[in-house]
């Protein structure tokens, strides 16, 4: 079924409850979902609360309905009902969007909650079929237990593979194995009219190109096909507390960057900056002895004490889970909730002056604010990075030429009111990093979205040189912009056009 193109029509009767179901449009939508037997979370129940409470409680949005499918035909039926009634549709996998895009990034969406579709099946040839609702920890455990195989992905086990793979998929072995989307061989996608299509390099190849970097703008990916690789026998995780001060930090950062230009692909790492100081941590695909040898050219220049943890692949995954006792996360599963703001940048190498400005800002403005902020500077590129191998135009992921990824996060607990100066703090940090670059020299990672960007700013920064082609493909596969959020790709002929309102309503989007 997953390789057929078909139109799903209404099925058996069921029952559905919707938000504000007091208008003709909402009543028609409710009836459509009911007639099609689409499972729905009921408002006022613990299930509704779980599905609609965002990871980032600073940005809370109210869906019109939450569909909880267990099979692809139910996704298609729900999408058909939404299209008929002019209701925008958003997929939600693990629900870890920093800007609540899994809830639509605005009120009034039909949310397709995919976490009941989490099956992972490994074939004898090493390929895997993974449903989009599977969490990364579950994917890692299943691939390893079924055949000692692995997939390159991020390190938070609760993140859903759906959005992670759709926009990139960076993790602590990515310089060796590339991004998650680099291992995608095919996908099964529900389009705006309820049609189910199979896409790959040979079938619907333009759609396949688009979903590897901008997937949420084009349909609901129900299932991915991935190539996998033999799980490494040894992965060595490490950390170094750096005894840097405002005077020594710029030279240390520059030395680290210089080392990273030619460091082996087996090594992926980051500088982590907090009010307490700087640390260097990462992972090496190999044993402890090989890691120590690889770090020799660096350690004498940056100082600090090296601590290591050697283990197998699943021990690597557990190490980065930061104390979570269970990485094999399946439903019902809830997320930690924070009130936060994130921003970031993908950039070329930085100059000595830029690192000086970076360190000065940390030592003055950032420290004085007292916010619970953190900054990560990941190594994305380099001479031996697998991420840098493909061309910018090979997939919709547009940042193959970038060397560094920066991520800024500022948070408080949900019970606290988020301080408004946190937004300014993040923007000021990003500006210090990017002000020396011209337009097009830097970008942003769509999996670390910035809620403060306008639609146009976000699209240019997330997709860069690939945006124009994405807009053309959007016009072909989603001409009426059903799959949308405030920062998603718009169809070429409709880039300056307002989305259609719900029938019988006038909504501001």
Curated annotation (Swiss-Prot):
Gene behind this protein: subF
Function: FAD-linked oxidoreductase; part of the gene cluster that mediates the biosynthesis of the immunosuppressants subglutinols, meroterpenoids consisting of an alpha-pyrone (4-hydroxy-5,6-dimethyl-2-pyrone) moiety attached to a decalin core fused to a five-membered cyclic ether carrying a prenylside chain. The first step of the pathway is the synthesis of the alpha-pyrone moiety by the polyketide synthase subA via condensation of one acetyl-CoA starter unit with 3 malonyl-CoA units and 2 methylations.
Cofactor: FAD
Name of the featured protein: FAD-linked oxidoreductase subF
Family statement: Belongs to the oxygen-dependent FAD-linked oxidoreductase family.
Signal peptide: 1-21
Alphabetical list of InterPro entries matching this protein: BBE, FAD-bd_PCMH, FAD-bd_PCMH-like_sf, FAD-bd_PCMH_sub2, FAD-linked_Oxidoreductase, Oxid_FAD_bind_N
Domain of life (superkingdom): Eukaryota
Carbohydrate-modified residues: 125, 193, 281
Expression triggers: The subglutinol cluster is highly expressed when mycelia and hyphae are transferred to fresh media for a 3 hour induction period, remaining expressed under conditions of heat shock. The cluster is repressed in cultures reaching stationary phase or in early germinating cultures, as well as under conditions of UV, salt and oxidative stress.
Residues annotated as domain FAD-binding PCMH-type: 59-231
Top EC group: oxidoreductase
Keyword Ribonucleoprotein: no
């Amino acid at each position: 079924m997953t390789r057929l193109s078909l139109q799903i029509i209404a099925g058996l009767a069921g029952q559905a409850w919707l938000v504000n179901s007091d208008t003709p449009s909402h009543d028609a939508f409710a009836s459509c979902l009911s007639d099609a037997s689409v499972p729905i979370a009921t408002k006022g129940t613990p299930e509704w609360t779980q599905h609609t409470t965002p990871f980032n409680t600073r940005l809370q949005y109210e869906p019109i309905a939450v569909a909880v499918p267990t099979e692809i035909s139910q996704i298609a039926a729900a999408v058909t009902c939404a299209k008929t009634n002019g209701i925008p549709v958003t997929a939600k996998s693990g629900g870890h969007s920093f800007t609540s895009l899994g809830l639509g990034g605005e009120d009034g969406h039909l949310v397709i909650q995919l976490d009941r579709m989490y099956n992972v099946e490994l074939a004898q040839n090493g390929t895997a079929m993974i449903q989009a609702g599977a969490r990364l920890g579950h994917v890692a455990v299943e691939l390893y237990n079924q055949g000692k195989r692995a997939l390159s992905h991020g390190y938070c086990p609760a993140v859903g593979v759906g959005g992670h793979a759709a926009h990139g998929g960076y993790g602590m072995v990515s310089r060796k194995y590339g991004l998650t989307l680099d291992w995608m061989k095919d996908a099964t996608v529900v389009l705006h009219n309820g049609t189910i299509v199979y896409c790959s390099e040979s079938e619907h190849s333009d759609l396949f190109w688009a979903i590897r970097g901008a997937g949420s703008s084009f349909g609901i990916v129900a299932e991915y096909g991935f190539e996998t690789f033999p799980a490494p026998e040894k992965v060595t995780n490490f950390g170094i507390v750096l005894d840097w001060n405002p005077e020594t930090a710029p030279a240390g950062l520059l030395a680290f960057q210089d080392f990273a230009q030619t460091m082996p692909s087996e090594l992926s790492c980051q500088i982590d900056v907090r009010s307490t100081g700087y640390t260097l941590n990462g992972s090496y695909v190999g044993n402890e002895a090989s890691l120590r040898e690889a770090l020799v050219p660096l350690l004498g220049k940056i100082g600090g004490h090296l601590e290591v943890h050697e283990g197998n692949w699943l021990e690597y995954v557990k190490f980065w889970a930061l104390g979570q006792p269970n990485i094999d996360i399946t439903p019902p599963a809830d997320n930690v909730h924070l009130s936060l703001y994130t921003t970031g940048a993908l950039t070329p190498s930085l100059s000595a002056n830029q690192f000086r400005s970076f360190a000065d800002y940390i030592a003055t403005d950032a420290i004085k604010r007292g916010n619970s902020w953190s900054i990560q500077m990941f190594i994305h590129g380099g001479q031996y990075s697998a991420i840098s191998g493909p061309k910018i135009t090979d997939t919709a992921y547009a940042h193959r030429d970038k060397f560094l990824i920066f991520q800024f996060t500022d948070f408080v607990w949900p019970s606290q009111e988020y301080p408004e100066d946190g937004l300014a703090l993040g923007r000021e940090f990003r500006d210090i990093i990017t002000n020396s670059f011209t337009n097009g020299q830097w970008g942003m990672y769509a999996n670390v979205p910035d809620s403060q960007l306008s639609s146009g700013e976000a699209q240019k920064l997330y997709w860069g040189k690939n945006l124009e082609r994405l807009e053309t493909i959007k016009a072909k596969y989603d001409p009426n912009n059903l799959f949308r959020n405030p920062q998603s790709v718009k169809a070429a002929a409709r880039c300056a056009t307002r989305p259609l309102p719900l029938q019988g309503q006038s909504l501001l989007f």
